[in-house]
Amino acid sequence: MIEQDFICSDSFESSGIVEWNSPSNIALVKYWGKQDNQIPQNPSISFTLSKCYTNTVVEFKPKKNTQNEIHFKFDGKENQVFEEKVNTYIKSIDKYFGFLKNHDLYINSKNNFPHSSGIASSASSMSALASCLVDIESQITNNDNNFNLKKKSFISRLGSGSASR
């Protein structure tokens, strides 16, 4: 598949809540550096830590104002640094999700493991968020599960090079 395959201009107005858990991973052999679009410079080897995961809940509602609002909480608390990263990420992927133009997002994310502990929390959080966004989109498309899985991997990687694992 190529990048163009993942662009969805379909739009809709609806509200709802989606939730995903994504496992983290820890690298045995790390990649060093990235190419364009978060593609790792070299191969790496990592282990999935299925009992260490990020839980992300996304509530989506038709937007209230002319600009989209994206609210982010980590562990139930506002976190300005993480919110800015999430906003930047969502702006970078909005061409792949037509519904982002007319919806506000309320995102709450938490890990069941310590943040900044050497476990790839950015990978699991981007994977969980990407999975939520693809699930929202799947409410209006007829994409099959195989396509949705590939899109989740593609969108996850744009947020973190390790997230598509």
Enumerate the language-model features and the residues they cover.
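ATP-binding N-lobe of GHMP and related small-molecule kinases
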Residues: 1-117, 131-145
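Short, electropositive, low-hydrophobicity segments enriched in small/polar residues
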Residues: 31, 126, 165
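Short helix-coil transition sites and intra-membrane helix breaks within transmembrane domains
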Residues: 117-123
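Short amphipathic alpha-helical face segments that pack within enzyme cores
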Residues: 124-132
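ATP-dependent small-molecule kinase catalytic core of the GHMP/sugar-kinase superfamily
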Residues: 143-165
